[in-house]
Structure formats: structure tokens, C-alpha cells
A protein has these predicted regions:
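Residue-level signal for inorganic ion chemistry
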Residues: 27, 65, 95, 123, ...
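Conserved AdoMet
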Residues: 30-104
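Short loop/edge segments at beta-strand edges and connector loops
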Residues: 72, 164-165, 262
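Conserved SAM/SAH cofactor-binding pocket of Class I
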Residues: 94-192, 218
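Mobile active-site "lid"/loop adjacent to the S-adenosyl-L-methionine
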Residues: 184-215
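Conserved Class I SAM-dependent methyltransferase catalytic core
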Residues: 210-274
Length: 276
């Protein structure tokens, strides 16, 4: 039997439990390190025992809603491959837009940067890769997340600092840029979250009390003493949170400009605090 026939049958089983059928072929192709052309040719060939065994192994994990990136063990972000597992969130394309915004607005200077809630280190390391004259510090409340972020720094061969901290609790000094993609999903919005996210990704990095605004409040209340005179704050937000977060920072920073910016789909996704 051709591999394509076996794959099609397995994909139907995935669709029956609400999983995307394409996850199986994607994970198989990446696991075998095949180009798209090589994958298409392989699908038309007779299935080998090894290939069938690999498909079954992948499918068994997808059936219990384990994300493809965790199965593969890495995720692509901003042109680089980051190791990911259940210790951290899988980096999202929307967060790449936040990184691109920071890079486009801060091009030449040597800056000090603090990433709050670094997770896999995707934001901090991406900034450090593109701006080798920046001094970047990555912080997280989770020691497990920091451990993985440090592994990514070693693999990518980028030197940044790491601090275990609940927001600013263990942070000293002032920074030119404070960036954060914090947990911002409220418990009332839990039903909007996909099963593969709920069952596998760390809830500490997903959900926040106070209707999802707890970490934004902490940042608003404490960032001032950790910002340089011309310092800026860049935040990722939930698509329904723009106006509230804007008002929160307008109250905390009455003399600064607060911008709500949209992602590529036209949804509120970033808040920027700067001097204008």
C-alpha cells in the first residue's frame, strides 16, 4: 500500500477528534527532514515498516492533542529554530511582529533590553541575534522555562543574561526597552483556547487573573523605576484588550505616548509606551 493511502486514513481519524489533518503530514515531513518535493515523491512510494511506525507514533500523540512542535521538539521563529517542550509556550507568528516592530523602531543605538516572561527565549534571543550591540536580559518566573531558554541560547550561540523573577521582583537597574508577551488569557475565555493548547502548553504562561490583566498591571505599576529617561515598553496583548491596556498605561504614564497597534490580521495585538 502506498504511504499516501495510509496517511489519508490516519488523517481521517485525527479529524474525528478535532485535530487538523495536516499536522500529521507536516510532523512526518519535518521528522524525516524531507523537502516538500521529497515528501510528495515518498507519498507515492510503497510504505515501509519504519515509515508506518513513525506515522503511528506521531498520530498517537496528535490524538491526545499534543502540538506538532512539541512532537518535533522545535519551532521556527523569526528565521531561527527554537527548542520547545511542555515547559514553555510555542512561539506564535504574532510575536514575530512584536520583534519586528522593536527592531524597526530601534535600529542603531546600543541599548539595554529586558524581556519579561521570556519562555523559550524567542523574543530575547531574536533581538540579540539582530542587534549584537544590545545588552539583553531574559527573565521568567519559571525556572523550568529559564532552563530551556538557556539551552536555546547555547544552541544558537548568543550571549544574554538570565534572571528568575516574578516581573520586576528580582530585577535591578534601568532599561532602554522593556518587552513582554505575558500570560493574558482570562479564565472566562478558556473556551476559546484550542484543546492542544489547553492540554499541553503551560497554564502559568497562558492564563492570568484579574480578567487577564494581572501582569499588565504589575508592569504598569513598577516599570517606571526600571526605565531609562527615553525608555520604551513593548507589549503583546490579547485582541480584545487594547483599550483597557491603553488606559492602564495612560494612567501610569500620563506624560508618555501610548499606542495600540494591529497585527497582520487587523486585530489589536501590541501596545507601545514611549516619549513620542
Amino acid at each position: 500500500m502506498k504511504l499516501a493511502q495510509i496517511l489519508a486514513e490516519m488523517e481521517k481519524q485525527l479529524e474525528a477528534v478535532g485535530e487538523e489533518a495536516e499536522s500529521l503530514s507536516f510532523t512526518f515531513r519535518i521528522s524525516k527532514n524531507l523537502s516538500f518535493t521529497q515528501f510528495v515523491l515518498k507519498m507515492q512510494a510503497e510504505a515501509t515498516e519504519d515509515d508506518i511506525e513513525l506515522l503511528k507514533k506521531i498520530q498517537s500523540q496528535l490524538l491526545v492533542h499534543r502540538p506538532a512542535q512539541y512532537i518535533i521538539g522545535n519551532a521556527e521563529f523569526h528565521g531561527h529554530s527554537f527548542k520547545v517542550d511542555e515547559r514553555v509556550l510555542i512561539p506564535r507568528p504574532e510575536t514575530e511582529e512584536l520583534v519586528n516592530l522593536i527592531l524597526s523602531e530601534n535600529q542603531n543605538s546600543s541599548l539595554k533590553v529586558l524581556d519579561i516572561g521570556t519562555g523559550s527565549g524567542a523574543i530575547a534571543l531574536s533581538l540579540a541575534i539582530d542587534r549584537d550591540n544590545w545588552q539583553v536580559t531574559a527573565s521568567d518566573i519559571s525556572s523550568n522555562a529559564l532552563e530551556l531558554a538557556q539551552e536555546n541560547a547555547e544552541v544558537i550561540d548568543v550571549a544574554i543574561d538570565f534572571v528568575q523573577s516574578d516581573c520586576f521582583q528580582a530585577i535591578t537597574g534601568k532599561y532602554d526597552i522593556i518587552v513582554s508577551n505575558p500570560p493574558y488569557i482570562s479564565e472566562t475565555d478558556r473556551e476559546e483556547v484550542g484543546l492542544n493548547v489547553l492540554t499541553s502548553e503551560p497554564h502559568l504562561a497562558l492564563f492570568a487573573v484579574e480578567d487577564g490583566y494581572a501582569v499588565y498591571r504589575k508592569i504598569a505599576e513598577n516599570a517606571q523605576k526600571h526605565l531609562t529617561e527615553k525608555g520604551k515598553i513593548y507589549l503583546e496583548i490579547g485582541y480584545k484588550q487594547g483599550e483597557y491596556v491603553k488606559k492602564l498605561f495612560e494612567s501610569a504614564f500620563p506624560k508618555m505616548r501610548i499606542r495600540v497597534l494591529q497585527d497582520q490580521f487587523g486585530k489589536d495585538r501590541m501596545v507601545v509606551v514611549d516619549r513620542g
